[in-house]
Structures are given as structure tokens and as C-alpha cells.
Amino acid sequence: MIMDDVKATVLSILQDLTGEDVSNNMDANLFDEGILDSMGSVQLLLELQNQLGIEVPVSEFERSEWETPAKIVAKVASLQ
């Protein structure tokens, strides 16, 4: 999957989960902004697994690696 497809899928998942369009600010800290919380993180990981086949055990989830849309896209791309 090319990076643009990964980005579009991640942004779509984030919008579905949070109701927020974060595409305008790819460096926004989703946790500090109150857009994503721990439950949202689990839902995000499940959706990434369902839609992209990415498996990240919750025990290996490092919040600092997943805190912005840009970091999420990069992390997903690195796991494919």
C-alpha cells in the first residue's frame, strides 16, 4: 500500500472514531487535544488491524509513537 493510501485510511479511521477531521493538522497531539484517549487508542488499533492487517498488541503500544496523525501514518507504514 502506498503512503497516500495509508494516510487516507488512517485519517478516515480517526475521523470515524473521533468525529474530528485532523487532516489539517497532522502534527496535532491527539491525546493532549482530547481527541483520542486510551479507549480510542484500542479502537484505533482494532480498526488498523481490521482494515490494514496491522497488528500491534496493546502491551506494545507506546503512546509517544502514536500521538499525532503524522506519527500514526509513519508507524503504520513501517509495520506493513
Swiss-Prot record:
SUPFAM superfamilies named among the record's database cross-references:
ACP-like
InterPro entries the record matches:
ACP-like_sf (IPR036736), DltC (IPR003230), PP-bd_ACP (IPR009081)
Its UniProt pathway annotation is: Cell wall biogenesis; lipoteichoic acid biosynthesis
**Does Phosphoprotein appear among the keywords?**
yes
**Which residues belong to any copy of the Carrier domain?**
1-80
The Gene Ontology biological process terms listed for this entry are: cell wall organization; lipoteichoic acid biosynthetic process
The post-translation modification note in this UniProt entry reads:
4'-phosphopantetheine is transferred from CoA to a specific serine of apo-DCP.
What one GO molecular function would you report for this record? D-alanyl carrier activity
Which GO cellular component terms are attached?
A: cytoplasm
Q: Where in the cell is it found?
A: Cytoplasm
> Modified residue O-(pantetheine 4'-phosphoryl)serine is at which positions?
S38
Pfam families in UniProt: PP-binding
UniProtKB keywords? Cell wall biogenesis/degradation, Cytoplasm, Phosphopantetheine, Phosphoprotein
> What does it do?
Carrier protein involved in the D-alanylation of lipoteichoic acid (LTA). The loading of thioester-linked D-alanine onto DltC is catalyzed by D-alanine--D-alanyl carrier protein ligase DltA. The DltC-carried D-alanyl group is further transferred to cell membrane phosphatidylglycerol (PG) by forming an ester bond, probably catalyzed by DltD. D-alanylation of LTA plays an important role in modulating the properties of the cell wall in Gram-positive bacteria, influencing the net charge of the cell wall.
Q: Which HAMAP family match?
A: DltC (MF_00565)
What family is this?
A: Belongs to the DltC family.
Name under which the protein is recorded: D-alanyl carrier protein 2
- Give the gene name: dltC2
